Amino acid sequence: MSMTPREIVHELNRHIIGQDDAKRAVAIALRNRWRRMQLPAELRAEVTPKNILMIGPTGVGKTEIARRLAKLANAPFIKVEATKFTEVGYVGRDVESIIRDLADAALKMLREQEIVRVRHRAEDAAEDRILDALLPQARVSSFSEEAQQSSGDSNTRQLFRKRLREGQLDDKEIEIEVAESMGVDIAAPPGMEEMTNQLQSLFANMGKGKRKSRKLKVKEALKMVRDEEAGRLVNEEELKAKALEAVEQHGIVFIDEIDKVAKRGNVGGADVSREGVQRDLLPLIEGCTVNTKLGMVKTDHILFIASGAFHLSKPSDLVPELQGRLPIRVELKALTPEDFERILKEPHASLTEQYRELLKTEGLHIEFADEGLKRLAEIAFQVNEKTENIGARRLHTLLERLLEEVSFSAGDLASTHDETPIHIDAAYVNSHLGELAQNEDLSRYIL
């Protein structure tokens, strides 16, 4: 990850409006991972990541920042909800499964990268195997044994290879030997995922090396053989070692809904999924060793980013030790009407662009006028103020309601409007949403 903080923020700005403080914090944290790797080994071990707590109402961009960060980082990344975990000893998932999932994500990411790297070699090997299955039908008895042995360079083989690449043989059926799959689906009870994974690995290893002959169309066989050849070219042990290092040195964990496990006031009871979960998170964030399929993973240098709306609780309701392990606090601001308007216009693949392109597939063209988007933003803000504030997610509800009739009758409208676009202006928005927005009872249930 060699992007500078300024470049990271610039990339995040393409997708997320506002929230500059949060973007700067995650950009610095991400850049610090790269800076740490440039240090001498003895000093590198001492530099630990500064974990982040993002505080802000729902729908302002906390989760979206995490999603975009995952794509930018090119590092093992996992997003989890704190509410899915229970204290050790109770039925449910314990927090150590976060690191096991992160290890799985790292292995999957590196395997995909390695398969891309060996793709051309795998394709060549797969083509050779398909041609070996095809060519006995093309040979004639007058060929000598020597000629058959050198058929790899023969004109016939080259001709078949050309036709195979052009897709002319896709529907031809061949018989080919492929690895026998011993995958077994096991329904895991809550908290037993690790044991289930081990059982599945056991069954998979039992079937390793077994092969069976199958009749397939060339197109299906080529894909199956290509995947098999790519898997054969990938060194699994080397891959696991790389994945282990990637998790320990570059891993990022995003814990959403952290406010839902905060203890609110003096609530009695067992508090299984609240304070117990927080206390289980402490060693994970501080640094401990977790057993995974890659081996023992040290969590000392994994970056943790926690986020929560904190509507019904405060950050101070978290246990003090957990507060201390999340030293960087970032507050995300509630969205203004201007923010809503920018969200509709500016981001790459904005909501309006998505609807425009979706309807274009039916031959229907729609255009959003600036005053129409401004009015839509005002209504979104008003409804959020009057009812529950769900942030930018309100725009999804409003746009779906606004374009409901157009989406339903898109095919008919396309034939009547020909190439003339439908204009979504302020008058159109008012006629479809104005009354609903003004009536608080209606907007509470419909918008």
Swiss-Prot record:
It holds the Pfam family AAA_2. CDD domains: RecA-like_HslU. ATPase subunit of a proteasome-like degradation complex; this subunit has chaperone activity. The binding of ATP and its subsequent hydrolysis by HslU are essential for unfolding of protein substrates subsequently hydrolyzed by HslV. HslU recognizes the N-terminal part of its protein substrates and unfolds these before they are guided to HslV for hydrolysis. Its main location: cytoplasm. ATP binds at I17, G59, V60, G61, K62, T63, E64, D256, E321, R393. It is found in: Cytoplasm. GO terms for molecular function: ATP binding; ATP hydrolysis activity; peptidase activity; proteasome-activating activity. GO terms for cellular component: HslUV protease complex. Keywords: ATP-binding, Chaperone, Cytoplasm, Nucleotide-binding. This is ATP-dependent protease ATPase subunit HslU. It comes from Pseudomonas entomophila (strain L48). GO terms for biological process: protein unfolding; proteolysis involved in protein catabolic process. A double ring-shaped homohexamer of HslV is capped on each side by a ring-shaped HslU homohexamer. The assembly of the HslU/HslV complex is dependent on binding of ATP. Belongs to the ClpX chaperone family. HslU subfamily.
